[in-house]
Amino acid sequence: MVEEFKVTPWEVEGVVDYDKLIKHFGTSPLTEDLLEKTAELTKSELPIFFRRKFFFSHRDYDLILKDYEEGRGFFLYTGRGPSGPMHIGHIIPFFATKWLQEKFGVNLYIQITDDEKFLFKENLTFDDTKRWAYDNILDIIAVGFDPDKTFIFQNSEFTKIYEMAIPIAKKINFSMAKAVFGFTEQSKIGMIFFPAIQIAPTFFERKRCLIPAAIDQDPYWRLQRDFAESLGYYKTAALHSKFVPSLTSLSGKMSASKPETAIYLTDSPEDVEKKVWKFTLTGGRPTLKEQREKGGEPEKCVVFKWLEIFFEEDDKKLKERYYACKNGELTCGECKRYLISKIQEFLKEHQRRRKKAEKLVEKFKYTGKLAQEMWNEAIPEPLKRS
């Protein structure tokens, strides 16, 4: 990986240069033309995730739009590895996925990889990851997906995924997996097999698959694109998001393993206030006098970055806040108070919906229209013949 930063499916370190990452991964920039086409086809104003380039890169998104425009359609696939409670950084890509499902009217498959987290996390038992799976599913349902067009499945329960993974695994030799994921002689054999399971949902339909996810997950889809057509399927398409920074730094990404750096979806208003006041990195000057004279540096400020990514919907207000900071008209305390109120407002509504989600788990996993189809469907013929 490029020397200044590191991005893999398991860790992100340093301040990421996203332009360099596009070149390194061989993806394409998400251009204004593609965003305008998205707005045209959906007849909608773009959400802030697209307007502000939080999603910045893609593979074959142009072909997704072409398929939709010409009536072939597509489907969505994303997922969650249940290793602990979900935080703000985990949930934001799900809101982007919800917008895509809503506006394009397509099916969505959400894979809960309780098996992966057991294999990759030494400190977790399989019972732990299954328990976290249920907890995380409540947060995902609270986003507001269509229960008849969304199938949420746990790998440990939906064993059909294993039958699909076997022919996929036959297409991937160890050299390929090692080159993409950096496996070594110390890697558990379950870890080496797991990419086949994560790739399997890209073959759930004979349409092109679109995966909205953070760019650290791209290696899985690069591997799928190497052999998908030999199985009679499309190469999967992807939309890549940037990382949500932790409260304490603009480098790396928010981590559940460092509680002080993250806002969890179950945090209380008091938790939010305490964390933002105590831990959040700002772009302020050492003294109020300097702040007034020289102005702040919003480009170095986590508070501003969080408002930009998710918590300030109004573009005009965000721009005004940027220049008020640059001109020394705003103090860091004022911005922190504003962010605290925005986070508290979001979490209050999310937690209300999360409580209601308890009654919807069965529908998303087993009894909804798409869920029933998936439990009753046979393994696709091209995979059977492989």
From Swiss-Prot:
A motif ('HIGH' region) lies at residues 82-90. PROSITE patterns: AA_TRNA_LIGASE_I (PS00178). It is an enzyme of class 6 (ligase). InterPro entries: aa-tRNA-synth_I_CS (IPR001412), aa-tRNA-synth_Ic (IPR002305), Rossmann-like_a/b/a_fold (IPR014729), Trp-tRNA-ligase (IPR002306), Tryptophan-tRNA-ligase_arc (IPR020653). The keyword Acyltransferase does not apply. One of its GO terms (cellular component) is cytoplasm. Its EC number is 6.1.1.2. The keyword Oxidoreductase does not apply. A motif ('KMSKS' region) lies at residues 253-257. Keywords: Aminoacyl-tRNA synthetase, ATP-binding, Cytoplasm, Ligase, Nucleotide-binding, Protein biosynthesis. It catalyses: tRNA(Trp) + L-tryptophan + ATP = L-tryptophyl-tRNA(Trp) + AMP + diphosphate + H(+). It is found in: Cytoplasm. It comes from the Archaea. Its main location: cytoplasm. CDD domains: TrpRS_core. One of its GO terms (biological process) is tryptophanyl-tRNA aminoacylation. Pfam families: tRNA-synt_1b. GO terms for molecular function: ATP binding; tryptophan-tRNA ligase activity. Belongs to the class-I aminoacyl-tRNA synthetase family. This is Tryptophan--tRNA ligase. It comes from Pyrococcus horikoshii (strain ATCC 700860 / DSM 12428 / JCM 9974 / NBRC 100139 / OT-3). The gene is trpS.
